[in-house]
């Protein structure tokens, strides 16, 4: 079904049915009552929806074998990043595409006492 080998489609369908049941167990709030009562019902409904979404993500993550949190990508310090367009940058839509240039020393843009 989803291009996986080893997992049965029946297990995936059971998982999807379970998630569908969770969402169906929380119908939208009624439109009756005072403004404050409606607001409270909507607030509680949205909170339940958030809980159902969280539970559904955990169920699918467990079934599909995914990590709960994405692995953070290590980035170099921002102080060492610079945009360097001294080389041929190109003008046909590829401008700004490429790997960032990392300098050992960050250059001083305006030295003390210099004027533009």
UniProtKB/Swiss-Prot annotation:
Biased composition (Basic residues): 36-47
UniProt PTM comment: Asymmetrically arginine dimethylated at one site by host PRMT6. Methylation impairs the RNA-binding activity and export of viral RNA from the nucleus to the cytoplasm.
Localisation per UniProt entry: Host nucleus, Host nucleolus; Host cytoplasm
Keyword tags: AIDS, Host cytoplasm, Host nucleus, Host-virus interaction, Methylation, mRNA transport, Phosphoprotein, RNA-binding, Transport
InterPro entries reported for this sequence: REV_protein
Ranges spanned by the short sequence motif Nuclear localization signal and RNA-binding (RRE), renumbered to the chain: 34-50
Positions of region (Homomultimerization): 18-26
Pfam families referenced in this protein's UniProt entry, alphabetically: REV (PF00424)
Example of a GO MF term: DNA-binding transcription factor activity
Assembly, per entry: Homomultimer; when bound to the RRE. Multimeric assembly is essential for activity and may involve XPO1. Binds to human KPNB1, XPO1, TNPO1, RANBP5 and IPO7. Interacts with the viral Integrase. Interacts with human KHDRBS1. Interacts with human NAP1; this interaction decreases Rev multimerization and stimulates its activity. Interacts with human DEAD-box helicases DDX3 and DDX24; these interactions may serve for viral RNA export to the cytoplasm and packaging, respectively.
Domain comment quoted from the record: The RNA-binding motif binds to the RRE, a 240 bp stem-and-loop structure present in incompletely spliced viral pre-mRNAs. This region also contains the NLS which mediates nuclear localization via KPNB1 binding and, when the N-terminal sequence is present, nucleolar targeting. These overlapping functions prevent Rev bound to RRE from undesirable return to the nucleus. When Rev binds the RRE, the NLS becomes masked while the NES remains accessible. The leucine-rich NES mediates binding to human XPO1.
Job of this protein: Escorts unspliced or incompletely spliced viral pre-mRNAs (late transcripts) out of the nucleus of infected cells. These pre-mRNAs carry a recognition sequence called Rev responsive element (RRE) located in the env gene, that is not present in fully spliced viral mRNAs (early transcripts). This function is essential since most viral proteins are translated from unspliced or partially spliced pre-mRNAs which cannot exit the nucleus by the pathway used by fully processed cellular mRNAs. Rev itself is translated from a fully spliced mRNA that readily exits the nucleus.
Family: Belongs to the HIV-1 REV protein family.
Protein name listed in UniProt: Protein Rev
Biological source species: Human immunodeficiency virus type 1 group M subtype B (strain 89.6) (HIV-1)
